[in-house]
Amino acid sequence: MIVGITQIALVVRDYEEAIAFYCEKLGFSVVEDTQLETKRWLRIRPQGGRGSEILLSRAIDDEQRAVIGKQAGGRVLFFFETDDFETDYQQLLSRGVDFIEGPFNQSYGKVAVFKDLYGNRIDLIQRIR
């Protein structure tokens, strides 16, 4: 029986620029950074976070480079949950995160949409409990 999702791969152009965005701007932590023969096994997650992690996977050919920033076909790729929307929203703004929509209220919670360094759309969301 499948019991969870542990990692989701994100194709990136460069490991270091992806770490800079996700860790320095968004406040994620590197969970593992293992050098393999031809790549790195590089996992990140929100500091103090739980659940799924993002595996940063450097593109190695033209086919993979073509999907950078387009892995969700223009839809939202990630949904990042917060327990303090206003504080996190203001902090991300102060760090130069590019919000493109919101904040706005939906029936399920408060949402703002931003783009990562490659143009992937990401929701910051605080759910109604």
Name each model feature, range by range.
Residues 47-52, 60-63, 84-86:
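Short, charged/polar surface micro-motifs in flexible loops or helix N-caps
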Residues 39-41, 62-67:
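A short, acidic/glycine-rich surface segment
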Residues 5-6, 73-77:
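Eukaryotic phosphotyrosine signaling hubs
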Residues 33, 45-46, 67-70, 89, ...:
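Short secondary-structure boundary/capping segments
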Residues 2, 10-53:
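Core segments of cupin and vicinal oxygen chelate
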Residues 1, 10, 40-43, 80, ...:
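Vicinal oxygen chelate
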Residues 54-55, 123:
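Conserved beta-strand in the GNAT
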Residues 21, 86-91:
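Short amphipathic alpha-helices within nucleic acid-binding modules
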